[in-house]
């Protein structure tokens, strides 16, 4: 019973950290990354479809993305979706390929992005702590139901705390790496 609670807590904490990594992958850090376009969707045959499901996205140069739609008729729609997005990119097209030149980030924009990065990290820390609280509540319930002894529950709560500390440290490490990447000129 206790092992199930610990395993579930760890699985949920791993998912929280993975979600943060996915979030960070979509944040523009001054260099081209195909994941930047993950949140951009295009109205395609009546359905909102992610750009990466409509085209090949490649990085020919460190600060350029090329988008080559499989269906040429979707090219103008993809261009419009990129212009409407909050990425601040201007697509240029030659009729078959869209090129996105990633401009250098201004110091002001870098600071804004770092604030976003810190906020997302804090949200992840809160999620991990909420998982800890849920696990501790579940452990107390086991003790109350006389399924586990007080000592076992105390040990398990210590394990949950160590797990929480480990994942918060991992979140801080990921945040620090992303922050460095953004502040790099």
Swiss-Prot record:
Q: Where does it localize?
A: Cytoplasm
Q: Which Gene3D superfamilies match?
A: 3.30.1360.40, Ribosome-recycling factor
Disulfide bond positions: none
> Where's it mainly located?
cytoplasm
Keywords, comma-separated and alphabetical: Cytoplasm, Protein biosynthesis
Gene Ontology cellular component list: cytoplasm
Coiled-coil annotation: which residues? none
Which Pfam family, any one of them, does this sequence belong to?
RRF
Segments carrying the region annotation (Disordered) are 138-157
BP GO terms, sorted: translational termination
InterPro entries under this entry? Ribosome_recyc_fac (IPR002661), Ribosome_recyc_fac_dom (IPR023584), RRF_sf (IPR036191)
Q: Which GO terms describe its molecular function?
A: ribosomal large subunit binding
List the transmembrane segments. none
Protein's UniProt keywords contain Cytoplasm: yes
What protein family is recorded? Belongs to the RRF family.
The record's section on NCBIfam families has:
frr
Q: Tell me the function of this protein.
A: Responsible for the release of ribosomes from messenger RNA at the termination of protein biosynthesis. May increase the efficiency of translation by recycling ribosomes from one round of translation to another.
What name does the UniProt record give this protein?
Ribosome-recycling factor
Source organism lineage? Bacteria, Bacillati, Bacillota, Clostridia, Eubacteriales
**Encoding gene per record:** frr
């Amino acid at each position: 019973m206790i092992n199930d609670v610990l395993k579930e807590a760890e699985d949920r904490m791993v998912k929280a950290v993975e979600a943060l990594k996915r979030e960070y992958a979509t944040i523009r850090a001054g260099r081209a990354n195909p994941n930047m376009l993950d949140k951009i969707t295009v109205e395609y045959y009546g359905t909102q479809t992610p750009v990466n499901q409509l085209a090949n996205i490649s990085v020919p140069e460190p600060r350029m993305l090329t988008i080559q739609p499989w269906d040429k008729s979707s090219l103008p729609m993809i261009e419009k979706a990129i212009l409407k997005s909050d990425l601040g990119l201007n697509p240029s097209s030659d009729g078959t390929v869209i090129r996105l030149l990633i401009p250098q980030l201004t110091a002001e924009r870098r600071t804004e992005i770092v604030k976003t990065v810190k906020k997302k990290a804090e949200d992840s820390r809160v999620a991990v702590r909420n998982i800890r609280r849920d696990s501790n509540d579940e452990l107390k319930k086991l003790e109350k139901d006389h399924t586990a002894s007080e000592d076992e529950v105390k040990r398990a709560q210590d394990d949950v705390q160590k797990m929480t500390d480990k994942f918060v440290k991992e979140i801080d490490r990921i945040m620090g790496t992303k922050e460095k990447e953004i502040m790099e000129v």
